[in-house]
Curated annotation (Swiss-Prot):
Keywords: Cell membrane, Ion channel, Ion transport, Membrane, Transmembrane, Transmembrane helix, Transport. This is Putative ion-transport protein YfeO. It comes from the Bacteria. Belongs to the chloride channel (TC 2.A.49) family. The keyword Transport applies. The chain crosses the membrane at residues 15-37, 57-79, 99-118, 149-171, 186-208, 221-243, 258-280, 301-323, 343-363, 376-398. Its main location: membrane. GO terms for cellular component: plasma membrane. GO terms for molecular function: chloride transmembrane transporter activity; monoatomic ion channel activity. The gene is yfeO. It is a multi-pass membrane protein. It is found in: Cell membrane.
Length: 418
């Protein structure tokens, strides 16, 4: 017979598995539709019209029209296509289900149109809202926070193709003063994360790792080098943190979402022309292209890092629906490659992984997620002790610093912001 503790853990097992599978399927469907639309906008349509895909006019035109389209969705839809991601953490309060269809449309348009944001925040918002709404009907005695945690875990597992990230993140958020053991509380979220990851794996495998030269043995000087790289990435990220609320306030003085997002799309188009096609979109596929291109120089990597970081700030400040983690990883890779080209004596594995750690830490302020992203992009077990050590001065540098998020004006209702 099972112990009462085991029976308690099993109570939410089936709902957790169902939520994990559903979270993954929603992500897969959204990404597939966005991929088809992206292929139409950036491959078939310019080919049919006889226009080069990297034509400046095409890049500016598509991104400007994308901004206008997203602005129309936000302006004229019930719920204004969900909350403004610039004002929200990755895991937030559930939104009304009526806002979800337009939020999904706004996300798909942004992903397909080349906006420098990832899918993580809107997908998280959708999955949390659905889990809370449906869960409250089916099992009303389970509180909203439980459904929120399960949906968040399932989404994280689906996004990264592994439950490890969810285990790391929730090991700190669920580790309170309760007498219930931590792993008892982690059981259902990990079930959701595992179900989400396995479901994603049936359709495609998220490919984060980069073909970077293997790192052999850790030296004492490598720790210093890694700490310096992380500090440089943090400094770059904090410039973006300073710019975001100011640009957000300036853009939102125009009040009209169509105008704000149209101008934002136009600026993104100009940045895309300067950085080239590799600086567009969420950044995961593009960072693979960046590493594969042997022709890039130190100045090219620097330009890509600056352009992508600027595009991330502009997209977030304008009100595009999307997440900041994936483009931040691209910025970290570009910074790391630039620093390796500038100082070849420091292995690329160190510069890239530590730059990712630093920039993702600025964006998320989550040490475990930052370590996870650095470790999966540069998968080398020899790096793990170094990354853990480098995390310490990086965390000290960011202690008490503002987060990459905009404080919502008090006079505005929760979900009416652009």
């Amino acid at each position: 017979m099972l112990h009462p503790r085991a029976r308690t853990m099993l109570l939410l097992s089936l709902p957790a598995v169902a939520i994990g599978i559903a979270s993954s399927l929603i992500l897969i469907v959204v990404m597939k539709i966005a991929s088809v639309l992206q292929n139409l906008l950036w491959q078939r349509l310019p080919g049919t019209l006889g226009i080069a895909q990297d034509s400046p006019l095409w890049i500016i035109g598509v991104l400007t029209l994308t901004g206008i389209a997203v602005g129309l969705v936000i302006r004229f839809s019930q719920g204004h296509a969900g909350p403004d991601p610039a004002c929200e953490p990755l895991i937030g309060a559930p939104v009304p289900p009526s806002a979800l269809p337009r939020l999904i449309v706004a996300l798909i348009l942004g992903l397909a149109g080349g906006v420098s944001l990832g899918p993580e925040h809107p997908i998280m918002t959708v999955n949390i809202a659905l889990a809370v709404a449906i869960g409250a009907r089916l099992l009303p005695r389970v509180n909203r926070m439980e459904w929120t945690i399960l949906a968040s875990a399932g989404t994280i597992g689906a996004l990264f193709g592994t439950p490890v990230a969810a285990a790391l993140i929730f090991s700190q958020t669920l580790n309170g003063s309760s007498e219930v053991p931590l792993w008892d509380r982690l059981f259902a979220p990990l079930m959701a994360a595992a179900a989400g990851a396995l479901t994603t794996g049936l359709f495609f495998h998220p490919h984060f790792s980069l073909p970077i030269a293997h790192y052999g043995q850790m030296e004492m000087t490598d720790i210093l080098s890694g700490a310096i790289v992380a500090a440089i990435a943090i400094a770059a990220g904090m410039v973006a943190v300073w710019c975001l609320p100011r640009l957000h306030a300036m853009m939102n003085q125009m009040k009209n979402p169509v105008l704000v997002l149209g101008i934002g799309g136009f600026i993104l188009g100009i940045l895309g022309v300067i950085g080239g096609p590799v600086s567009l979109f969420k950044g995961l596929d593009e960072m693979q292209q960046m590493v594969a291109n042997q022709a890039f120089s130190t100045s090219d990597y620097f330009l890509l890092a600056v352009i992508k970081l600027a595009a991330l700030v502009v997209a977030a400040a304008s009100g595009f629906r999307g997440g900041r983690i994936f483009p931040a990883v691209f910025v970290g890779v570009a910074l790391g490659l630039m620093l390796h080209e500038h100082v070849p004596a420091v292995p690329a594995a160190i510069t890239v992984s530590c730059a990712i750690l630093g920039i993702v830490l600025v964006v998320t302020r989550d040490g475990w997620l930052s370590l996870f992203m650095a470790a999966v992009v540069v998968p080398n077990t020899t790096l793990l002790p170094l990354l853990c050590i480098v995390m310490l001065p990086a965390w000290l540098l960011l202690a008490g610093k503002p987060m990459m998020m905009v404080n919502r004006p008090k006079q505005q209702p929760p979900h009416d912001n652009v």
